[in-house]
């Protein structure tokens, strides 16, 4: 997995290599200082040789200055490498998400995807940038060089800290094995916190309207406490690393002082050599502590890396594998014995044995009770989901044979949940066509009756919509979305209950405008109100995922029980 993660460093690898080179030279210079100090004490101070003291002092100062410059360089290069790696991983994840089908997205919670794009990437990033690269590069070099020098000073004394190495290794392995699953749980707790915050902010108006602020506060307190507890469990285990290392380190130093003192007394070791040896032992033990911290950081990064790889390794179930270089020309639609379920392991189909035919330019209404899979049915046309059995055809060709870009360019959907983006009204309309002229935009707005209220907006087409279009009503938002879809100039237009917030008079104008101005466009209208579909060329009745009846308003009113019941209930409610 590490190899895959670091493959995203790409053009930033040179900065990582430069950082490691700077770190390596910096460490060598730092390790020269104790050797120079030993010579200064044993040959300069001991014999009062002032010129020798000055010479060694200048050499030590030069090493320190060069090490400082290289330290700054390594910090800069490692930061560039870490930030670049993080940016590339985020981009790779985001690109992968754009290729997800609806069923792929259903495998993850939105809050979890946000965490995997932010917090998890930051953990990987930190393991490469200053906080990770420097100790990762410094510790092995310091350990190898300092150990070699320590043995060259006195091999007998060096055996003391060799005893400590297996103890330190065993302690570190035990901590890592225990802490890795705790880091995974902590990241999952962050997912839950993000989900709670996201839901609250998205539905803040509902929360206020139902006076549920206290309930939401309690819910947040619960997930916040859960994150705190999971974090405490992880970090309680992590902090054991430092005192355990220090215990072994101080015990080792004490042993070296006892044995070294005896060697000095016997004349087998100079005071400067003992001082230098202790300096190298401290360097060795500090390098081991740094390595242990690096391992802990890598453990957390690996937990995050595994979550990131789940996003990148998600198998895309809707591809262009069977696609040919063709485009939708007419908008003829055919469902041929289609069966569909969201999950392969599900026992029952959501849609069963669906068959119907729509001629180019026809207007087709789809009506049925809530939960009858009306939306699911139309989502099969642009391949937001793929059928399990049967075939969906456009212009006599299986939709799987169209390149997805060409297929979806030819189909415009106005979904149940109307989405507007931050920006001006004009920029939202141009989502339908970036190159649309103002004349085309005004024409689309006229058909969708947007022109009826646009003059009342503070800045007309330049009015800022706010996040999600908060400064326009539900009906106005629906009309804007319809205009946006018209600007796409599709061969097939799907309106999924997208006039539910529009009054019947305005809805009639929109219907008339679509019929007169866009007669060749195939139109599919999902609706709850019979008034929205009664003028359609064909009306399809769905019931529990099956077609219960098809025909015109008059024929269904004459012989379809479900249609009659809907008609009578709405007639009583004065909707017709």
Sequence positions of predicted segments:
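A short amphipathic helical element positioned immediately N-terminal to and/or at the very start
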Residues: 1-11, 113, 117
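Transmembrane helix-loop-helix hairpins at lipid-water interfaces of multipass membrane proteins
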Residues: 10, 16-73, 77, 151-156, ...
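An intracellular "coupling" helix at the cytosolic face of ABC transporter transmembrane type-1 domains
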Residues: 11-14, 99-103, 119-136, 140, ...
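Hydrophobic alpha-helical transmembrane segments of ABC transporter permease domains
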Residues: 21, 29-33, 70, 118-164, ...
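Hydrophobic alpha-helical membrane-associated segments
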Residues: 25-29, 33, 61, 66-82, ...
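Short intracellular "coupling" helices and adjacent cytoplasmic loop segments at the cytosolic face
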Residues: 47-48, 83, 91-115, 119-121, ...
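Helix-loop-helix
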Residues: 49, 148-163, 176, 233-306, ...
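ABC-type nucleotide-binding domain
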Residues: 326-576
């Amino acid at each position: 997995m590490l190899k895959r993660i670091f493959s995203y460093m790409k053009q930033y690898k040179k900065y990582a290599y430069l950082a490691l080179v700077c770190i390596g030279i910096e460490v060598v210079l730092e390790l020269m200082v104790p050797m120079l100090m030993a010579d200064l004490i044993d040959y300069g101070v001991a014999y009062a040789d002032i010129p020798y003291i000055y010479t060694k002092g200048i050499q030590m100062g030069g090493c320190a200055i060069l090490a400082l410059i290289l330290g700054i360089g390594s910090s800069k290069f490692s930061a560039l490498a870490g930030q670049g790696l993080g940016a590339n991983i985020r981009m790779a994840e985001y690109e992968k998400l754009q290729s997800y089908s609806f069923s792929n997205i259903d495998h993850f919670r939105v809050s979890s995807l946000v965490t995997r794009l932010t917090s998890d990437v930051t953990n990987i990033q930190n393991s490469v940038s200053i906080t990770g690269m420097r100790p990762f590069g410094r510790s092995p070099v310091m350990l190898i060089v300092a150990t070699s020098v320590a043995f060259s000073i006195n091999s007998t004394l060096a055996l003391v800290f060799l005893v400590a190495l297996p103890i330190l290794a065993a302690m570190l392995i035990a901590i890592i094995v225990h802490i890795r699953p705790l880091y995974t749980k902590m990241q999952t707790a962050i997912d839950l916190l993000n989900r709670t915050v996201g839901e609250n902010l998205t539905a803040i108006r509902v929360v206020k309207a139902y006076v549920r602020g206290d309930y939401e506060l309690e819910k947040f307190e619960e997930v916040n406490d859960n994150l705190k507890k999971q974090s405490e469990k992880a970090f309680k285990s992590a902090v054991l690393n430092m005192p355990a290392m220090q215990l072994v380190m101080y015990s080792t130093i004490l042993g070296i002082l006892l044995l070294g003192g005896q060697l000095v007394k016997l004349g087998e070791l100079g005071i400067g050599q003992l001082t230098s040896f202790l300096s190298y032992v401290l360097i060795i033990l500090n390098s081991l502590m740094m390595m242990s911290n690096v391992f802990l950081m890598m453990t957390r990064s690996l937990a995050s890396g595994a979550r990131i790889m789940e996003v990148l390794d998600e198998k895309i179930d809707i591809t262009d594998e069977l696609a040919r270089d063709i485009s939708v020309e007419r908008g003829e639609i055919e469902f041929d014995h289609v069966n569909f379920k969201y999950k392969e392991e599900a026992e029952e189909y959501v849609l069963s044995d669906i068959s119907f035919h729509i001629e180019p330019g026809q207007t087709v209404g789809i009506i049925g009770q809530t939960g009858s899979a009306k939306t699911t049915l139309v989502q099969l046309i642009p391949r937001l989901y793929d059928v399990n059995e049967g075939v969906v055809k456009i212009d006599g060709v299986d939709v799987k044979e169209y390149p997805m870009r060409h297929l979806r360019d030819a189909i415009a959907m106005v979904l149940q949940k109307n989405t507007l983006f931050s920006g001006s009204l004009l920029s939202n309309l141009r989502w339908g066509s970036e190159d649309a002229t103002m004349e085309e935009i005004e024409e689309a707005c006229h058909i969708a009756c947007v022109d009826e209220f646009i003059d009342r907006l503070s800045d007309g087409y330049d009015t800022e919509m706010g996040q999600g279009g908060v400064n326009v009503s539900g009906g106005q938002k629906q009309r804007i979305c319809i205009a946006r879809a018209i600007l796409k100039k599709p061969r097939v237009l799907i309106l999924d209950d997208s006039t539910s917030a529009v009054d019947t008079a305005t809805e009639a104008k929109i219907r008339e405008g679509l019929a007169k101005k866009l007669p060749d466009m195939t139109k599919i209208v999902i609706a709850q109100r019979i008034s929205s579909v009664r003028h359609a060329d064909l009306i399809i009745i769905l019931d529990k995922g099956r077609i219960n009846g098809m025909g015109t308003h008059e024929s269904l009113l004459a012989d379809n029980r479900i249609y009659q019941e809907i008609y009578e209930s709405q007639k009583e409610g004065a909707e017709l």
